[in-house]
Amino acid sequence: KRFKTKDHLISMLFCAFAKCTSLREVSGAMLGLSGKTKHFRLDHIPRKSTLSDANKRRDSDVFGMIYNKLMRTYGHYLSDSRIKDVINKQIEIFDSTTISLFKDIMKCVGRKPKSGKRKGGMKAHIVLNVDETVPKMIWFTHAATNDHVLLSKLKFNDNTIYVFDKGYNDYRAFKLFCEHKTGFVTRIKDNAVYESIHCNTIEDYIHSGVLEDKIIEITVKENNKTSKLRLRKIRFYDRVLKREFEFLTNLFEMRADLVAAIYKLRWQIELLFKQLKQNFPLKYFLGDNENAIKIQIYCVLIANLLMTVVQKMLKRSWAFSNLVSFCKIHLFNYIHLLRFLENPDKDWQKEQ
């Protein structure tokens, strides 16, 4: 009962920065160096059993709310409106990642390994603003869940364009996007069945890479009824990758090459996933229940958000991975982080 949410959060953030692989490591490290943890402002350093119980009983949504509150507080440091100024709409990327590469994600099938660490994984579905660098919304599912069922969770807005991969193809969801005047750009599936209605004129297609721009109709099956949905299909040749792409969108008025450029922005979320996996690897879960796994992932996202804000606040240029490594090294040192990072050689220069 005395292990409050604040202490729980600090303990799990310590786990993320120190890259601990077990609850025993988390508890043992903080207890062993308890004299150097005053700046953590912990009211109670947890033992392994205390942390395990808290991960099981404290609702993971609490940590989701903390993440969202931090986003509202520090969001102005993250915004970069250059892209929005060109498109004049909010572009949001929707994608998923499997947190760990091991199978049998939430089920923990089979015997417990000798190491006492259960291998597994969970799929995180993330919405990312193009003019920001951290997730805006997060949902968790079993890895076996089809991606397209998550489209219904997106918020419809006539000032928003969603970008997602063809794994999220769902014609009923596309119909809802059109009804709510919400834009989307995705890739058409290889086996898609459609009827060509009209071919748009392509201007300067050799320069822009647009090979084909046509209006098509697809059949939407819903509640034992079928209806027709009119969309736009663009065939585009990427000179860098030297391959063709076929895009599906409901942006009928936008230039075809601009639609292709919007889809290219989807790579930003891949960079986010790479950043998370490189700097806060989740190779092992510290609990064998869904709630504990979600808490661990939320705390990794909170750590990533805090480091991103620090990076944006600094005038001095720092690589993200170097910032995370620096914090790991100095976890038990009490320093003014921003002041030190602006001039890490200051004390050394004085001595010289």
Q: Could you describe each region identified by the protein language model?
A:
Residues 76, 80-81:
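Active-site phosphate-binding and catalytic loops of NTP-dependent enzymes
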Residues 40-60, 68:
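Major-groove recognition helix of helix-turn-helix-like DNA-binding domains
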Residues 31-41:
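Extended, structured, electrostatic nucleic-acid-contact surfaces
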Residues 1-25, 29, 58, 65-69, ...:
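Single, function-defining residue in the core of a domain
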